[in-house]
Amino acid sequence: MGFNESLKIAAQGLNAERIRMNVISSNLANINTDDAGNGLPYIKKEPLFKTVKFKNYFGVEVEKIENAKNPFSEKYDPSNPLANKAGYVKTPNISAIRELVNMISATRAYQADAQVISESKAMSQSSLQI
């Protein structure tokens, strides 16, 4: 693998993890959004990654950002104007703990990709000194 290939693959990883972090941030910011303007709560988003072939190596990119398939949660709040006749309000089915774990995972992957770029640059500079 050449210098350019390793940089391109690591850069793809950085970009994918950046998008993943943005999606996680959006989910956390909307964890209490009971009405997203359409009468329904905010729907959790999830990035869908796909493998991208680059010569003889593989990288990654975000293919699309999908709405989560899990249903909404319900909480009992009869005083809420969005409550149904039984007094329940639909809320986003977002777990703050899961999102924070995903954020840590994305951060670590981002750091690993940044380290690959740093090491590739150092190896390239060392080879120029030979």
Question: Can you name each region flagged by the protein language model?
Answer:
Residues M1-I130:
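Amphipathic alpha-helical polymerization modules
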